[in-house]
Amino acid sequence: MAAGSITTLPALSGDGGGGGAFPPGHFKDPKRLYCKNGGFFLRIHPDGRVDGIREKSDPNIKLQLQAEERGVVSIKGVCANRYLAMKEDGRLLALKYVTEECFFFERLESNNYNTYRSRKYSNWYVALKRTGQYKLGSKTGPGQKAILFLPMSAKS
């Protein structure tokens, strides 16, 4: 190489020119989603119920976040083998199969917590009350502690 010359590296194939964005697919390691409101981990039960628990050894808090497209994820309970969904009445539950109600816009907020806003019901967020129960989507909004989640490693 001559002095002052510039070398360019080839772009990664299949990145769609996304400027460093992850291609669609799962994030390698399972996560636990820690809610700022009450210190609960989001839990998906095998029977489809959704709530929060403080016990970090509960196997039902291990979640797989799947990138569906840029900024959109689905959230699957690893042990429950079910997908988090928000219904038209704002309830959270877990389904055996992915539907349009299972896609959430994931956003990193300025306080370094993530929010998960329903793609289908666009003003509603995944949220946990201080009691550990889920909060109806229709009762959620920006600025609430209940919608703030910190993704943490769930490696055993």
From Swiss-Prot:
Residues that coordinate or bind heparin: N37
UniProt PTM comment: Phosphorylation at Tyr-83 regulates FGF2 unconventional secretion.
Site feature Important for interaction with integrin, where: K129, R130, K135
Gene Ontology MF annotations: chemoattractant activity; chemokine binding; cytokine activity; fibroblast growth factor receptor binding; growth factor activity; heparin binding; identical protein binding; integrin binding
Keyword entries, A-Z: Angiogenesis, Developmental protein, Differentiation, Growth factor, Heparin-binding, Isopeptide bond, Mitogen, Nucleus, Phosphoprotein, Secreted, Ubl conjugation
Proregion residues excised on maturation: 1-9
Residues recorded as bearing Phosphotyrosine in the entry: Y83
GO biological process: branching involved in ureteric bud morphogenesis; canonical Wnt signaling pathway; cell migration involved in sprouting angiogenesis; cerebellar granule cell precursor proliferation; chondroblast differentiation; corticotropin hormone secreting cell differentiation; endothelial cell proliferation; ERK1 and ERK2 cascade
Gene Ontology cellular component annotations, sorted alphabetically: cytoplasm; extracellular space; nucleus
Pfam families: FGF (PF00167)
Protein's cellular compartments: Secreted; Nucleus
Region (Heparin-binding): 129-145
Signal sequence annotation: none
Per UniProt, location of the Glycyl lysine isopeptide (Lys-Gly) (interchain with G-Cter in SUMO1) cross-link in this chain: K96
Sequence similarity: Belongs to the heparin-binding growth factors family.
Chain's role: Acts as a ligand for FGFR1, FGFR2, FGFR3 and FGFR4. Also acts as an integrin ligand which is required for FGF2 signaling. Binds to integrin ITGAV:ITGB3. Plays an important role in the regulation of cell survival, cell division, cell differentiation and cell migration. Functions as a potent mitogen in vitro. Can induce angiogenesis. Mediates phosphorylation of ERK1/2 and thereby promotes retinal lens fiber differentiation.
Oligomeric form and interacting partners: Monomer. Homodimer. Interacts with FGFR1, FGFR2, FGFR3 and FGFR4. Affinity between fibroblast growth factors (FGFs) and their receptors is increased by heparan sulfate glycosaminoglycans that function as coreceptors. Interacts with CSPG4, FGFBP1 and TEC. Found in a complex with FGFBP1, FGF1 and FGF2. Interacts with FGFBP3. Interacts with integrin ITGAV:ITGB3; the interaction is required for FGF2 signaling. Interacts with SNORC (via the extracellular domain). Interacts with glypican GPC3.
Protein's name in the database: Fibroblast growth factor 2
Organism field: Monodelphis domestica
Gene: FGF2
